[in-house]
């Protein structure tokens, strides 16, 4: 779960830049927060038509938590996990074609922590998130997958599933 200050800007980034789809929303007005679940894979209507569960059959989901009115508080911020004291600091998204993914990110005018051509590791890139906290999106290619993207928070290697 990632807490976000501005749900609209966060959803725009993860959907428009990272290419995720909003899979489900859970609103809790009495508690003052909403949950947004994003991921890759078929839309609910496509999945249902093919007889699969559209949420549980995803390779991974990203949960965004938005507390009401935080976007209107100029002094409100979350710790990003990359500054001291360090903690959870990035999200890993594996792609089949890193060059194509980086070209897409260039077209979307993302900010980079590490471009594919920077440094010694040529099989990984870091995109800065749109959040003021600058959470990273880690984009490696060494994770085999058949889907367009694979979201795996732990960045553990996974075997491609046979279809």
Give, region by region, the residue ranges found by the protein language model.
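Vicinal oxygen chelate
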Residues: 1, 23-26, 37-39, 82, ...
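Short acidic/His/Gly/Ser-rich catalytic and metal-binding motifs that mark active-site loops
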Residues: 71-75, 145
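Active-site/binding-pocket entry motifs
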Residues: 43-44, 67-72
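Short, polar loop/linker segments at the starts of domains and inter-domain junctions
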Residues: 74-83
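Amphipathic alpha-helical segments
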Residues: 5-22, 104-107
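C-terminal "cap" of GNAT-fold acetyltransferases
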Residues: 28-50, 54-59
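Short, low-complexity disordered segments enriched in Ser/Pro/Gly and basic
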Residues: 56-58, 82-87
